Amino acid sequence: MIDLPRHPPSMLPVIRTVPEHAATGELKRRYDAVKSAFDVPWMGVVAMAHTQYPRFFDALWEGFEPIAGTRAFQDACRAMRAATEAGVERSLGISPLAHRLQDLGYDPREIGEIRTIIEVFSHGNYPYILLATVSRYLLSGGDLSGEPQVFETSPRSPHIFHQPILMEPHHADEHTRGIFADIQATLALPILNTDYRALARWPSYFHLAWAELRPLIRTPSHAALSQQLHEQAIAVLRTLPNPARLKGDMVTRGCGR
């Protein structure tokens, strides 16, 4: 059985990607295919990085896209989300911010918009986690064990999500750029994830939320939750159906550009 230890993000190489607005032709087709399969309005950086190696990505996606359409995959994403959110509520003790935002002058519509953006990423991050986990597992010599014949596709009602408006570093004031830098340093991230750029659209909320979260990073409870999610993703990939018979040698043959 292949061992996949959890590595901190700082061990990642430099990630080079093409932003969605600049993607054209075959690259845009790949981006659109991922967003459609995952029912999300944004292309995650982890998937963008995969598409920088087109032959590899196409081989992986040919087998992974049918998996993403199964009920088992979608149920697994929901279960991972539920376990993570329950763990956060149980062990991190994060304080609600709604009343503090109201004191700053936020009305219910504005708070609702923030909650919608949070829902976009809370819904959409888990398919990307599973894509990254399956990709790493296959490249490490593993093979998916799920049966190709036994699976149930899941017709779903697409979420009506609009593409998030992002606060890029060159849009932000000095204070927000400082928070961006602090997030990357504190979380040891080689890139600034889309989630943070989307939530920074409301700077006063963003400052409050990061001030609340930052002291919890790297605490034993935070580390345990991170490890729990990592282990849950590995457990899921070993039970997923495999309708297109995705195998490790299929993706390793595509590792050249």
From Swiss-Prot:
<dbReference type="InterPro" id="IPR029032">
    <property type="entry name" value="AhpD-like"/>
</dbReference>
<dbReference type="GO" id="GO:0033975">
    <property type="term" value="F:(R)-2-haloacid dehalogenase activity"/>
</dbReference>
<comment type="similarity">
    <text>Belongs to the HAD-like hydrolase superfamily. S-2-haloalkanoic acid dehalogenase family.</text>
</comment>
<keyword id="KW-0378">Hydrolase</keyword>
<protein>
    <recommendedName>
        <fullName>(R)-2-haloacid dehalogenase</fullName>
        <ecNumber>3.8.1.9</ecNumber>
    </recommendedName>
</protein>
<comment type="function">
    <text>Catalyzes the hydrolytic dehalogenation of small (R)-2-haloalkanoic acids to yield the corresponding (S)-2-hydroxyalkanoic acids.</text>
</comment>
